UniProtKB/Swiss-Prot annotation:
Keyword Nucleotide-binding set for record: yes
Additional record remark: Despite having conserved helicase domains, this subunit does not have helicase activity.
Protein name per Swiss-Prot or TrEMBL: ATP-dependent helicase/deoxyribonuclease subunit B
Enzyme Commission code(s) on record: 3.1.-.-
NCBIfam families: addB_Gpos (TIGR02773)
BP-aspect Gene Ontology terms: double-strand break repair via homologous recombination
Biological source species: Clostridium botulinum (strain Langeland / NCTC 10281 / Type F)
Co-factor binding comment: Binds 1 [4Fe-4S] cluster.
Amino acid sequence: MSLRFIYGRAGSGKSQYCLNSIKNRIEEDIDRPLILLVPEQFSFQAEKNLIEVLDEKTGFKTQVLSFKRMAYRVFNEVGGITAKHMNESGKSMLLYNIIEDNKNNLKVFKKAAKRQGFITTISDIITEFKRYNITPEIILNNLENIEGDNLKYKMEDLALIFSQFETRLHKNYIDNEDDLTILVEKLNKSKQFDNAEIWIDEFSSFSPQEYSVLEKLLLKSYRINITLCTDYLNQGRFVDTTDVFSPIKNTENKLLQIIEDNNIKLDKPIALKCDPCARFKNSAELQHLEKNMFSFPYKEYKNETKDICMLKTLNQFTEIENTAKDIIKLCIDKGCRFKDIAVITGDLEGYENIISSVFLQYNIPFFIDKKREINNNPIIVLILSALEVLSKNWTYESVFRYLKTGLLDINNEEMDILENYVLANGIKGYQWTNDKPWEHKSFSNYELEDQALKELLAKINDIRYKAMEPIVTLNKNFKSIDKAKEFCEVLYEFLCNINLPDKIQNMIEDFKVEGEIEKASEYNQIWNIVMEVLDQIVEVIGEEKISLKEFFKILQTGFSEYEIGLIPPTLDQVMVGSITRLRSHNINTLYIVGVNDGIFPSPLKEEGILSDDDREFLGDKGLEIAKDTKSIAFEEQFLVYSTLTTPSKYLRLSYPIADGEGKTLRPSIIISRIKKIFANICEENDIVKLNGEEEELKNISSAKPTFNYLISNLRKDVEGVKIDNIWGDTYKWYLENEFWIEKLNRLIKGFDYTNQSKYIETKKIRNLYGKPLKISVSRVEKFSQCPFAYFVQYGLKAKDRKIFNLSYPDLGIFMHSILEKFSHELEKKGLEWDTMDLNWAEEEIDKLINEELDNKSLDILNSSKRYEYVTKSVKKILKRSIWLIGEHIKRGNFKPSYYELSFDIDGDYPPIAMELHSGEVINLIGRVDRVDLLQKDGATYLKIIDYKSGIKEFKLSDVYYGLQLQLLIYLDAILTELAERSGINGEPGALLYLKLDDPIVKNTVDMSDEEIEKSIIKNLKMKGLILNDPNVIRDMDNIISGISDIIPVMVKKDGGVSEGRSSVATKEEFETLRKYVRYTIIEICEEMLEGNIEIKPYKKKDGSSCDYCIYSSVCKFDTNIRGNKYNILIDKKDEEVWDAIKKKLEYKNI
């Protein structure tokens, strides 16, 4: 019985020494068991290395074991395990059930138990207790020593959960974490390790469980040799926590304590020298890094480096692209093999997708060494979403998550049809399962004949029944059961009924044919995982009564703990992984990417359930558990040391200055440390672009990425930018390659691409728009905003997918409708706005809105509590609006005369006819919300009012550009009709926008009701254009003094109008505007009928017509594309507008 330490720094050859020692023992033919004990993740590599040192005939004489493998060997020899092992998934499901049963008994964790991830946290701490040989009884026996209620209650909760977990677990199962505890007991009976010589390699520390196993092995074996990655120790047992080797020295001290307690001999240690280290014999730079990275003071390396390089990049994508180029260069120039290269990072999740994308493009074979979560696998999504449909009562999200897994007998076209219908009509809950066919007609944006509509509805109902039938059956079967075991049986029947096993098998075969071996391997494991989870539920809680929601949660918990490990499909490939999972020292070349602050070294971990203070206190009381975050942070430097000393030939560290979102990233402290040690380190960056053939050559590597660089340079050449001659040679290579020539020619043609199609044939446009042209004034304005958007909306009739919600336009239409009905009700009853009873008016508004809701004309307002609130708000707004209208009318002499005055064939007035220069007549249709009239001095003055639910300003500049034409053309049409029909001398009075709102008045505590009303009136002041006539103005606001609070006018003390502070126009100016608007509409309509569909949105200083356009995905407008330019509209002052309008009319002789 003896222990021997093998000391050596990283790369000194400790592992090789072990292998050589084993070989020597075999050659000496000593009859003694030979064991190589390594961590589980190193076992495959250790076996491979051992075979390389020995041969096939002698290799079998040595066993390569991990602690887990050792346990299984002993159990097979002497017995010990009669129950099955429960995996992490089963543990989590059991813990979920225990916590649910005991949630009311928990003192600290009652609320936390509901949080996502809590089960995993509890599972982790139970694992920690077991590895540190702590039982529920030990926790309970130490409770009296714990001061402070918070920690005491925590430990009581943990003891309760842990105790019940142990009791219920051991009925049918055993925990994987119990294996080493049982191994310690069974080693006494085992003969396998009697007089054995054991070599222990690649460990930096051990858990208390493992120390107990080692103690037993020391008592049974001839000798244990253990490698320690450190200097030769001769300074006693004192450990400086800041020393890079402090974790190793702690390990040595614990082993020394064990042999001291058991009177075991300590053999003379082996100290491997490192001048140079075996690993770095061909690289003085890597040798220097190993010696000085954590030496204080360090020795500076003066020469320029070639084996250690740094790369500073613009972002993570360019970082990986540069890494790929360097790998290709190494393989071509230096004959490096992919299998000798590793790319590692402290943020594998953030880099994984980028690495996959770039390496595939560069044809670099790679394997990402990580376990895959299964929660996003379609099979798991199908199972969980099917249960979610039932537990959440057929919500849209759960139903279509289930349907979109691709594992059901519904194709994509059927799915789209069904989804469009469901979204348009807000289908949810019982609407899915009742027997009545769906008959809503509000689901298509396109007008269909009755027969076509019936056929489409029939098809939708067929798809609906096909989609819901399996889940309806599942729900029916669930309703008659209440035990966990029965839920599992019913779910299994459901999966078989939808032929899931056969579908999975077909998918696996398809993946294999397509060469997607990793996908095939993943799907091959998933079905077995599902069965394993169901089996464990049956065996652990099978007889317990649970609800459907609990079953869903238990399954969700079980699946969340599973991770799939995949085997590398080939040997010659780049290994990509996390820094913490770096498994092999047989790496020549190592790329560490993302060497940024907070990534490598990794930041401090969260303290978890037990804080650092808790752990320190428990340790002082004799309850030793895992290290606190501070100790782990000190150990992180040993991980840094181990990582940096892994490669034998070449090391490159790279760091981006920004992440994918453009947020600044700082370089790690490792970067600055290495720069100090290596004053002339090889350092590159891709931030400052250098010119020259040598730099351009770096972009020529694999065919696909080089092709992308070639296209980029050819575009520069087309744009007149000088490019390097090397791209001419590259172009010739692709031209002579059959595989690339077609792609090359196609992309070169793309240099002339434009998304513009400025005009289409007049005949075609007539067919689209109709003849004669009948068009609303708002559509004319739409054309002015962007001809292409108009063409798509009214020519192609493309519309947004209908969604069951209430948009602002919908709300505006609804409020207009109620106001119209209210206005007609006033007329019918012979009431006036300025004298009506407000209580009656408010009751009438309530009645009209309730009638609309009862008639289901706006179903959505009855569909949820949220929309009930919206309805209340609408009622408040309309009540405020009728009060406001009444106040306006009280203040003047204009009287409401027309409501919803329409211009159409069957309207109040005929369509507004306009003759184009070709002689063709177009008909404008539209509707005016309200027209007030004033009889004065033999003339009839018109005040046209447009109700708006949002903010609307009147701008002469917008009139000039054709963006604001409606009120003026209506004014012109009414004045014309009055003159021609009745011989009435009509005059313009005002064009106004009235906002429908119920504004909040702030600081009302000290305000009287009258002051509040004044504030509201002022807040809702109308915008528009008023006739510049003081008398007419007073007929709109008879109490005006200074600035009016209802119309956009200010009068001076002498009674005149302050034109600079008012929005006014003279009678002559109104006449000018009437002419200009007619001329503008004719010009716009002629452009329209000539086939102008140019993508030319307007742009002003406050925005563009693209801001809220729903057709941006159709036009692909981009100022970088040739021919794509905004129609820049400069906001003109009113004086400038008047001048411009007059000049244009004079030029056109109008």
